[in-house]
Amino acid sequence: MINGVFLREIASILRCDLSLIISEFEYELLTKTFRIDAEILFYLPFLAEEIEKNTTSFQKRQHFVSIGNFLHEPNWQTVLKLKQIWKYIRKNLPEAELHIYGAYATEKVFQLHNEKEGFLVKGRAVSADEIFRKYRVLLAPIPFGAGLKGKLWESMKFGLPNVTSSVGAEAMSRDLPWNGFIEDSDEEFINKAVILYTNESIWNQANENASVILEQVYCKTVHIQPFWTTLYKITDHLDNHRNTHFLGKILQHHQLNSTKYMSRWIEEKNKNLLL
């Protein structure tokens, strides 16, 4: 876990006056495991300004959907997993289709397209909002990747229940009931996808769960005022804040000096080249 990228990110946090952390899991990891001072961190997740109540009903929706740009490796691996398990879902629901959306889809992605199997690669979505409003179930067997998943948050906003993995649901809902199902085994994932697609009462309950999650975890009014209070407190006492968290000053000092001496080295090297 501790590698060059990790050390660079921790150093960046220490050099900053305040870092915004969108995941409670990562916030606790930083404060409890790596002992980063909570005064230079602020938990600020995705913010839901207004919760949409009149979402498209179960009966007016159809088909499964997966969405995510293909520059992000977990999205590609998610689609590969769906390609493996889709035939088993399709066996139970022969009229259902799975539509795959995502920007930057290359030829290898479009090669997965198979109309006979009902596995349709659509490419870039013109309007993500429209996508979330017309499908019945979002499938997201995400195999790896940290942080909050935007597609799952959007699915809550637009009344689109989902089946995802424990990685996908990480830090998304605290301990509140999920808006769908969280399954890591292929067998259970397939089973829950079929149930969520066919059982209207379970589907409606999933949407009720989504409303609760949005109100208790992502409500803008809950988070925004404490954020501004913290920001103004730091800016009003900036020198004291920086002196208290002197590790950041040490790192900035060494970073600036390393740049200064590197520039001198380059100057001397260029002089020698001109001789």
Map each language-model feature to its residues.
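Acidic donor-binding loop of glycosyltransferase active sites
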Residues: 17, 133-147, 158-160
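C-terminal amphipathic helix plus adjacent low-complexity
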Residues: 202-204, 211-275
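Conserved catalytic-core segment of nucleotide-activated headgroup transferases in glycan assembly
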Residues: 32, 41-133
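Short hydrophobic beta-strand element within catalytic cores of glycosyltransferases
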Residues: 151-155, 161-165
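Helix-loop-beta element that forms the nucleotide-linked donor phosphate-binding surface
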Residues: 13-15, 20-21, 27-47
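Membrane-proximal helix-turn-helix segments that form the acceptor-binding/catalytic region
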Residues: 1-19
